[in-house]
């Protein structure tokens, strides 16, 4: 089992990375409309009086401390949403009880990661013969200072198992419990590339939309194309 205490800390480095979000999930305007936590609380209370869907839009706010939300940055909503709208099925470094912001070193890597998971999910939907999905491509600027460097772990380690996330989950839980900022690790879906698993959105300084990408599924993801230029 990987001991996070034995992983080296990353030095300060301001980087650009990429991710995809399904276009059916709009940005959460409330996160982007305020400059700090005090403004957020005031506006949230006011909107809650007239908007019965507000809680569904903002997600489970109890899962993230207000101090962790990077209010005032471009794309605060995109940075925060993974921590309030948590996939209960979990992910590589989460058991489903907390959120993780996943980033990739290139858009091709982000596409490869999403392609794999979309293929796996829709292949289990009985009777589905064709579907079209549109994703927003996001460009994220962040500082990896203080994160743990899991790229020193060989790809043969169980945390990199392509399907069994049990060991990666255990590592993620220990990193989360230790209040570490996140991990840099090797992409399992695009050899030679890196990904990041942020346990908090605090390192993010900007996250903006670039292009839209279309995926066509007809038994498998048969095509991916950009449908709007960066």
Task: Please state what every model-predicted region is.
Residues 99-103:
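A short, exposed loop/beta-hairpin motif centered on an aromatic-Gly-Thr core
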Residues 105-107:
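Internal, conserved structured core segments that host functional sites
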Residues 1-65, 69-94, 116-230:
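Active-site and NAD+-binding cores of ADP-ribose-processing enzymes
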């Amino acid at each position: 089992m990987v001991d996070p205490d034995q992983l080296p800390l990353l030095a300060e480095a301001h980087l650009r990375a990429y991710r995809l979000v399904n276009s059916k999930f709009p940005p959460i305007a409330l996160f982007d409309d305020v400059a700090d936590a005090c403004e957020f609380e005031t506006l949230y209370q006011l909107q809650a009086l007239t908007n019965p869907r507000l809680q569904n839009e903002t997600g489970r706010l109890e899962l993230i401390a207000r101090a962790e939300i990077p209010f005032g940055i471009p794309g605060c909503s995109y940075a925060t949403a993974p921590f309030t709208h948590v996939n209960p099925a979990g992910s590589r470094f989460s058991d489903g009880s907390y959120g993780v912001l996943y980033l990739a070193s290139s858009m091709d890597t982000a596409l490869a990661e999403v392609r794999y998971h979309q293929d796996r999910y829709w292949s289990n939907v009985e009777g589905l013969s064709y579907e079209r999905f549109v994703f927003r491509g996001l460009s994220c600027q962040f500082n990896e200072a203080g994160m743990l460097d899991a790229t020193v772990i060989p790809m043969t380690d169980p945390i990199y198992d392509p399907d069994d996330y049990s060991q990666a989950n255990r590592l993620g839980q220990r990193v989360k419990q230790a209040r570490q900022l996140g991990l840099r690790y090797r992409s399992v879906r695009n050899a030679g590339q890196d990904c990041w698993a942020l346990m908090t959105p605090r390192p993010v300084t900007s996250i903006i939309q670039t292009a839209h990408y279309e995926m066509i599924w007809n038994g498998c993801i048969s095509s991916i194309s950009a449908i709007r230029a960066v």
